[in-house]
């Protein structure tokens, strides 16, 4: 959530930044006018209340003097009626301002490339060289079916489109991957957490999914509960409405969880395979940091995600997202895109973002600065470390052999009971 004071005092700069995220200047101008109206009404209310207090004192004095108070009582009633009417108007204005501040996206950092969409993203670096095959590489969905480890047909029968069963070494591979990821993040100082997979609406508001993106979630009908779209939600809200000790920052959390997404607006995109599912496992990283340290922490978090891909020897590239492609809560985002041979393309496998104080303001996560004793909003960061299903897809395609088998990456073999190959 944006700071209304920042919008008020630095309006032109904020408007210019938000315009790069598709926010119409007319929206901000309307917000500015409503905010000015609110402040004028507040002045009127305080003036009227002061007058009412004066009249009340005069009534008390008149009663002590046994004087007639009818006129003064009538005047006080009129003042009270005016205050009541203005309070009602203020409530409407506050609701409108809340709607503005909770639905406007975060302000992009100066280092974020300006652009309309993903075509304007900027590649930062690459790692590894895509493998050259001496045979036609298969898509991971075909490999998975041929190996008997992925079953979309029965997933569709039991649930519906974009669901599947992992079987045998497929299930073992999925488990090996997320255990490996959690172990690697643990070495980097992350505390492993098992979170609830259901959260309340306040938690969804805290991280920015609500109210704007309700259509992307699975709500439990007639309840205050939602299936988590990412472990970012429970991990970040762990400290909601709390004040942390500044000397304890930064704090690192990691968790593996299922993620549930309706994929509204994704009709026709990635209809086959593991790239876009309604339910998938993901290992998440979340950080709580002091403002002056958050961008250094973003670079470290991105490196933590890269470490997984490097140890799995999967070629990838790092991309800085443009202002038009970043997520709602982010002020800066790096995407990691892994090479998918059958698509001859890099596909997103991780997204690492600094939200600065955007989520912390919504969730009221603060810290007491040990330097001056003041309570301040901290910065929150989140990143995938990694999306597990997409990692399975990348391994199946990059490690496939001409006979249809798939070699298991060396880093995962200790987690696979020593198995080296998945054979048809």
UniProtKB/Swiss-Prot annotation:
Gene name per UniProt: serS
GO molecular function, one term: transferase activity
NCBIfam families cross-referenced by the UniProt entry: serS
GO cellular component, one term: cytoplasm
Quaternary structure annotation from Swiss-Prot or TrEMBL: Homodimer. The tRNA molecule binds across the dimer.
Binding site for L-serine: 230-232, 284, 384
Entry's EC annotation: 6.1.1.11
InterPro entries given in the database record: aa-tRNA-synt_IIb (IPR002314), aa-tRNA-synth_II (IPR006195), aa-tRNA-synth_II/BPL/LPL (IPR045864), Ser-tRNA-ligase_type_1 (IPR002317), Ser-tRNA-synth_1_N (IPR015866), SerRS_1_N_sf (IPR042103), SerRS_core (IPR033729), tRNA-bd_arm (IPR010978)
Root EC class: ligase
Keywords: Aminoacyl-tRNA synthetase, ATP-binding, Cytoplasm, Ligase, Nucleotide-binding, Protein biosynthesis
Free-text function comment from the UniProt entry: Catalyzes the attachment of serine to tRNA(Ser). Is also able to aminoacylate tRNA(Sec) with serine, to form the misacylated tRNA L-seryl-tRNA(Sec), which will be further converted into selenocysteinyl-tRNA(Sec).
Domain remark in the UniProt entry: Consists of two distinct domains, a catalytic core and a N-terminal extension that is involved in tRNA binding.
Superkingdom field: Bacteria
Localization of this protein: Cytoplasm
Protein name (database record): Serine--tRNA ligase
Pathway entry: Aminoacyl-tRNA biosynthesis; selenocysteinyl-tRNA(Sec) biosynthesis; L-seryl-tRNA(Sec) from L-serine and tRNA(Sec): step 1/1
């Amino acid at each position: 959530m944006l700071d209304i004071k920042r919008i008020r005092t630095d309006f032109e700069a904020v408007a210019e930044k938000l315009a790069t995220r598709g926010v119409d200047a007319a929206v901000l101008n309307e917000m500015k006018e409503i905010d000015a109206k609110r402040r004028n009404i507040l002045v009127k209310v305080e003036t009227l209340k002061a007058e009412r207090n004066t009249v009340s004192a005069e009534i008390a004095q008149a009663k002590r003097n046994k004087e007639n108070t009818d006129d003064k009582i009538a005047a006080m009633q009129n003042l009270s009626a005016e205050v009541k009417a203005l309070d009602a108007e203020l409530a409407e204005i506050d609701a409108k301002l809340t709607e503005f501040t909770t639905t406007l996206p975060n302000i992009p950092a100066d280092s974020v490339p300006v652009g309309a969409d993903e075509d304007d993203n900027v590649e930062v670096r690459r790692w590894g060289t895509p493998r050259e095959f001496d045979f036609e590489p298969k898509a991971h969905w075909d490999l998975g079916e041929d190996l008997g480890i992925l079953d979309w047909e029965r997933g569709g029968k039991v649930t519906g489109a974009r669901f599947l069963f992992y079987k045998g070494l497929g299930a073992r591979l999925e488990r090996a991957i997320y255990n490996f990821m959690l172990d690697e993040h643990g070495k980097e100082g992350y505390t492993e957490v098992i979170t609830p997979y259901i959260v309340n609406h306040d938690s969804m508001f805290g991280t920015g999914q609500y109210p704007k993106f309700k259509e992307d979630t699975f709500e439990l009908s007639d309840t205050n509960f939602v299936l988590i779209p990412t472990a970012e939600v429970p991990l970040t809200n762990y400290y909601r409405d709390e004040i942390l000790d500044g000397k304890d920052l930064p704090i690192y959390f990691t968790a593996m969880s299922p993620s549930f997404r309706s994929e509204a607006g994704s009709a026709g995109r990635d209809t086959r395979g593991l790239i876009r599912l309604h339910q998938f496992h993901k290992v998440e990283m979340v950080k709580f940091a002091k403002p002056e340290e958050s961008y250094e922490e973003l670079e470290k978090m991105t490196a933590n995600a890269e470490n997984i891909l490097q140890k799995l020897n999967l070629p990838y590239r790092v991309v800085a997202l443009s202002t038009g492609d970043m997520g709602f809560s982010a002020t800066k985002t790096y995407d990691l895109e892994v090479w998918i041979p059958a698509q001859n393309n890099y596909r997103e496998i991780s997204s690492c973002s600094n939200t600065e104080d955007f989520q912390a303001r919504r969730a009221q996560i603060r810290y007491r600065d040990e330097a001056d004793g003041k309570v301040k909003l901290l910065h929150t960061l989140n990143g995938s470390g990694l999306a597990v299903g997409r990692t399975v897809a990348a391994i199946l395609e990059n490690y496939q052999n001409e006979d249809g088998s798939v070699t298991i990456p060396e880093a995962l073999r200790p987690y696979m009971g020593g198995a080296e190959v998945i054979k048809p």
